[in-house]
Amino acid sequence: MLLADVVRTSNQVSVMSSRNAKVSLIADLLHRCALLVADGAVPAAEIGLATRYLAGSLRQRRTGIELSTLSRLPAPAVGGDVTLFDLDAVMQRASEMAGAGSSRARAELFLGLVRRLSAEERAFVLGLLRGGLRQGALESVVMTAVADAGGAPLDDVRRAVASQGDLPGVSQALLVDGPGVLVLFRLTVGRGVSPMLASSAKSLAEALAKTGPAAVEWKLDGIRAQIHKQGNDIRVL
């Protein structure tokens, strides 16, 4: 799938105020991506990439591309020929570079991609890199769109994502294999669970009614972590 298709949908979503309209636009794009996969035109992994990019994140946690590189960009191109895989491949190669000269190599690699991007595509990619993509499509909106595109109950999608912490993976599986695949997503030792915050209550009385007797302490600064143990293997997530 072309990056331009995702960027166009993102830009349309960014000017929409209606949540339902945003969901509909994203679901339509994911459905079109699934049709391309079914026809053998693109690999199934592009569904996951489209989902991830519309939710505002890259697959690579760190690319190593320095922000200073982003201030020396060539003029925008006509664009329209860069695919989702093209973008992911550049980011993956950048993330794997190390050693002497790697910063310069990353910059050259990234600039090679940028020279092929239109102004709209460039703004989208820079937003992903900076982690500040403003398009009005929070993960909850994208998750609802995934459920709509895949014809699955939203609660089933939420449960699958919560157990695996992987919305793109759930999206790809659902749109390729159908709603029945969601039962395969279960809690797995060593894999982080998404919801790390307790659900809210309207009042203290309501909270205590749900939990029963409780001890309450002042909240201290610290970190929130999950500890997974399987035999002698212990992971802190």
Indicate where each model-derived feature is located.
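N-terminal nucleic-acid-engaging modules of covalent nucleotidyltransferase systems
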Residues: 1-237
